[in-house]
Amino acid sequence: MSARLDDGVRPGEIVLEHASRAFSVRADRGRSLKELLIGRARAGGPPPVEALKDVSLRIEPGETVGIVGRNGAGKSSTLRVLSGIVPLNSGRVACGGQVVAQLELGAGFGRDFSGRENIFLNGALHGLVKEQIEERMAAIVEFSELDDFIDAPVATYSSGMFLRLGFAIAAHLDADVLLIDEVLAVGDEAFQRKCEARIAEQIAAGATLVLVSHDAALIERTCRRVVVLDGGRKIFDGPVGEGMPFYHRLMGTPEEVAAP
């Protein structure tokens, strides 16, 4: 997915100010209408879950930032807020320039369409005209390694093929800001290295990167800054060389075990 949330910031700049976001919890499945009405009248329903609590970040153009934390710490919620998928309850978010979010690869695919047709569809959704998509078609197909299957319906693809096509499309979009959430475990080890190399090319071209991953080694070799979230709050923001030891202590993970 790509989006534009400029709001007066420079291309590649990200601003998050006092951001808070809560989600309602629905534990209503399997209950009758009467039980729902009585339960809500008595208890008012479960309280909302606070995914982000007064989080502020400023990321300069070209920075590479990793976001780490326990499950449920607010990492994915942060990327969804930055991408414009999820609105804030309070606070401000602004991302300058073209934002490319790799959160759920292939989420917008038409399963009855071929891989090639989905490239055209997704390219158009990201603002590319037909001529621009055609110019990138060969590179996308080559990167995906789906040459023999590109004209088959994606419904016939394996999960790995599906994800490879999704990454290949996203990797060939013009990006001022890259938002990546746990999507680099795509395909075999050789393909993963190719994905990392492509991201490195985009960073070298000036793109800002915000990466969410449980892979500590990936964060350390890709990012220069790390943000640690816990319970929806920012508890560390600084150089990766200081942040990852802090994260390992938080998780109770010895650094020598976390390293590959």
Positions of PLM-derived features:
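H-loop/switch region of ABC-family ATPase nucleotide-binding domains
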Residues: 213-214
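Pre-NBD coupling/linker segments of ABC/ABC-like ATPases
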Residues: 1-51, 240-255
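Conserved ABC ATPase "signature" region
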Residues: 33-41, 120, 132-149, 166-168
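Conserved ABC ATPase "signature" C-loop
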Residues: 231-232, 247
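The feature captures the beta-strand-to-loop junction immediately N-terminal to the Walker
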Residues: 68-70
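A short, surface-exposed alpha-helical micro-motif characterized by mixed small hydrophobic
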Residues: 219-221
